[in-house]
């Protein structure tokens, strides 16, 4: 489903449904949960493959730690964002507003001026409103969405290469890139 056709987002605790203008439901992702880590001036954001789990999985967690090292991040407790926020329907615009407010609040309290999202295609287009590998704005904050950690594990040669190329091209290569 194209992001422009999304009328509402509804969660039942396990799956998220995108609802179009005709009331049809689409389930491109499970209840989404992302965790954000401040790394210098960049919020590095990871989509959890299992939103019911308390943290990233064993392999995605190791990959996340490696990526955070590229940004020179110190280990700390991640900040988490759930979408939709409740089991009530939430429009794609409301989800974007909630995510924008979440990062604006984090930036005011902890710093950070941009965000790098490691998320799947569905979440990037529905909530960030843009295609992956292209810079977008999240409110006033520059943002870039690249492949999710799970995609980087499933297809490392393709996903890591295209994600890294986009990060370099848009100035999101971390403190060591």
What are these regions, as identified by a protein language model?
Residues 1-177:
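A polyanion-binding, active-site-adjacent surface
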């Amino acid at each position: 489903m194209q992001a422009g056709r999304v009328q509402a987002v509804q969660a039942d605790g396990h799956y998220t449904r995108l609802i179009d203008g005709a009331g049809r439901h689409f389930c491109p992702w499970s209840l989404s949960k992302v965790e954000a880590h401040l790394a210098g001036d960049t919020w590095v954001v990871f989509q959890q493959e299992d939103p019911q789990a308390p943290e990233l999985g064993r392999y995605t967690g190791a990959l996340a730690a490696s990526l955070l090292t590229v940004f020179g991040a110190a280990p700390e407790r991640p900040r988490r964002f759930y979408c939709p926020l409740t089991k009530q329907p939430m429009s794609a615009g409301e989800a974007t507003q909630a995510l924008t407010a979440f990062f604006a609040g984090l930036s005011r309290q902890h710093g950070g001026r941009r965000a790098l999202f490691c998320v799947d295609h569905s979440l990037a287009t529905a909530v960030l409103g843009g295609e992956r590998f292209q810079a977008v704005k999240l409110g006033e904050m520059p943002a870039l969405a690249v492949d999710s950690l799970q995609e980087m594990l499933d297809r490392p040669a393709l996903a890591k290469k295209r994600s890294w190329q986009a990060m370099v091209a848009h100035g999101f290569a971390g403190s060591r890139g």
